[in-house]
């Protein structure tokens, strides 16, 4: 890491001591320290969450590097580094000289590519940890997922003390568990390397490439007719700006003296909503019909399981991507919402955007997907 006080600054300090102008010296040193603390890198900054994070960091006065495998935006305020996070040679220049790294790179959960998840989420993250240490980075903030404790059964107001899932619902979750364990296990205050993990759930908002587009595509294809279960299961959906806010709070509160190091924190909108109510509001906001027929949860789950087995059998010949997998049925038909109390107490977290405002802004941002009646 670059020295906190450069050689010219040391000369200035020496001269100032001779003139007994110590207040100016202290002010200059403090300014240097503040500037260093606000130098960061966003790994995965071209993605959905990453772009929103970069925008909020810039608005708060941070100097931002972006590291990504693809160029997702062009912003002259940002230093962009193109590369593979599994390559230390690619990654090191983007981390050298920064105080904080936000690691939010991951393949989308829907990709279902086991090898890709393992390579990026686990192998890549281990490389991030080692390269951070080599580059002198002091803080590593990981974007994890609340799904690391979800096994397809109800979770109501779940806390971070719940154990990791013994039977993760998909490859994404399986590798996020490995990833989070690696990052939290690397926390080392004695060597001035501090880590924490943010666990959002159901991220949505403007420019979302997954939830809303996939939902609308399913509606257009006539696949959003049925509610799985009774439709009363509460779920956490989290507006992207609230997720970013949680990351930045964690970075700013993380220190040797804080209780954040080596711990995970749930970050949600703190307003659990029935899963099907959320989807219905998005659909009707874009002029699509809400699902109105009900199918028992157990029927949907076993049908999805049977279909998945069939897809596995014929996969050497035909490649199919079923809409409702057992994982998606579990996500759609069970309770899974999480407590933010730890984040509230440790870092003063409160959602910045309410669910009503978040949904309105999201719907307005996808007007191009609106159905014309």
Curated annotation (Swiss-Prot):
It is a single-pass membrane protein. It catalyses: a 3beta-hydroxysteroid-4alpha-carboxylate + NADP(+) = a 3-oxosteroid + CO2 + NADPH; a 3beta-hydroxysteroid-4alpha-carboxylate + NAD(+) = a 3-oxosteroid + CO2 + NADH; 4alpha-carboxyzymosterol + NADP(+) = zymosterone + CO2 + NADPH; 4alpha-carboxy-4beta-methyl-5alpha-cholest-8-en-3beta-ol + NADP(+) = 4alpha-methyl-5alpha-cholest-8-en-3-one + CO2 + NADPH. It is found in: Endoplasmic reticulum membrane; Lipid droplet. The modification Phosphothreonine is found at residue 22. A motif (Prevents secretion from ER) lies at residues 370-373. Gene3D superfamilies: NAD(P)-binding Rossmann-like Domain. Its main location: endoplasmic reticulum. Pfam families: 3Beta_HSD. NAD(+) binds at residue 176. It is an enzyme of class 1 (oxidoreductase). The active site is at 172 (proton acceptor). The keyword Lipid metabolism applies. The modification N-acetylmethionine is found at residue 1. The keyword Oxidoreductase applies. GO terms for cellular component: endoplasmic reticulum; endoplasmic reticulum membrane; lipid droplet. Pathway: Steroid biosynthesis; zymosterol biosynthesis; zymosterol from lanosterol: step 4/6. Its EC number is 1.1.1.170. Keywords: Acetylation, Cholesterol biosynthesis, Cholesterol metabolism, Disease variant, Endoplasmic reticulum, Ichthyosis, Intellectual disability, Lipid biosynthesis, Lipid droplet, Lipid metabolism, Membrane, NAD, Oxidoreductase, Phosphoprotein, Steroid biosynthesis, Steroid metabolism, Sterol biosynthesis, Sterol metabolism, Transmembrane, Transmembrane helix. The chain crosses the membrane at residues 298-318. Brain, heart, liver, lung, kidney, skin and placenta. It comes from the Eukaryota. It is linked to Congenital hemidysplasia with ichthyosiform erythroderma and limb defects: An X-linked dominant disorder of lipid metabolism with disturbed cholesterol biosynthesis, which typically results in male lethality. Clinically, it is characterized by congenital, unilateral, ichthyosisform erythroderma with striking lateralization, sharp midline demarcation, and ipsilateral limb defects and hypoplasia of the body. Limbs defects range from hypoplasia of digits or ribs to complete amelia, often including scoliosis. CK syndrome: An X-linked recessive disorder characterized by mild to severe cognitive impairment, seizures, microcephaly, cerebral cortical malformations, dysmorphic facial features, and thin body habitus. Belongs to the 3-beta-HSD family. Catalyzes the NAD(P)(+)-dependent oxidative decarboxylation of the C4 methyl groups of 4-alpha-carboxysterols in post-squalene cholesterol biosynthesis. Also plays a role in the regulation of the endocytic trafficking of EGFR. This is Sterol-4-alpha-carboxylate 3-dehydrogenase, decarboxylating. It comes from Homo sapiens (Human).
């Amino acid at each position: 890491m670059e020295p906190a006080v450069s050689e010219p600054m040391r000369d200035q300090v020496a001269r100032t001591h001779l003139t007994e102008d110590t207040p100016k010296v202290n002010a200059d040193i403090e300014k240097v320290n503040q500037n260093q603390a606000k130098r960061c890198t966003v790994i995965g900054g071209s993605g959905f969450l990453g772009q929103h994070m970069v925008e909020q960091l810039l608005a708060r006065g941070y100097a931002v590097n972006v590291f990504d495998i693809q160029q997702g935006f062009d912003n002259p305020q940002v230093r962009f580094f193109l590369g593979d996070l599994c390559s230390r040679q690619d990654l090191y220049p983007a981390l050298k000289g920064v105080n904080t790294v936000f690691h939010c790179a991951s393949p989308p959960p829907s990709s279902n590519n086991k090898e890709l998840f393992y390579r990026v989420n686990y192998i890549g993250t281990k490389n991030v940890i080692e390269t951070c240490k080599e580059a002198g980075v002091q803080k590593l903030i990981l974007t994890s997922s609340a799904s690391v404790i979800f096994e397809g059964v109800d979770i109501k107001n779940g806390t971070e003390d719940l154990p990791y899932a013994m039977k993760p619902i998909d490859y994404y979750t399986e590798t996020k568990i490995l990833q989070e364990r690696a990052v939290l296990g690397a926390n080392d205050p004695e060597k001035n390397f501090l880590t924490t993990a943010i666990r959002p759930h159901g991220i949505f908002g403007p420019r979302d490439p997954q939830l809303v587009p996939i939902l609308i595509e399913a509606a257009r294809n006539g696949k959003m007719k049925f509610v799985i279960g009774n439709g009363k299961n509460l779920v956490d959906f989290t507006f992207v700006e609230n997720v970013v806010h949680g990351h930045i709070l964690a970075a700013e509160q993380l220190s040797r003296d804080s209780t954040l190091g080596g711990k995970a924190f749930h970050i949600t909108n703190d307003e659990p909503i029935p899963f099907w109510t959320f989807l219905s509001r998005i659909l009707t906001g874009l002029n699509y019909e809400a699902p109105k027929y009900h199918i028992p949860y157990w029927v949907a789950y076993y049908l999805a399981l049977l279909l998945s087995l069939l897809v596995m059998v014929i996969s050497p010949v035909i490649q199919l991507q079923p809409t409702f997998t057992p994982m998606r049925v579990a996500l759609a038909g069970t309770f899974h919402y999480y407590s933010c109390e730890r984040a509230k107490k440790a870092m003063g977290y409160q959602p910045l955007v309410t669910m009503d405002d978040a949904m309105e802004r999201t719907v307005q941002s996808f007007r191009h997907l609106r159905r014309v009646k």
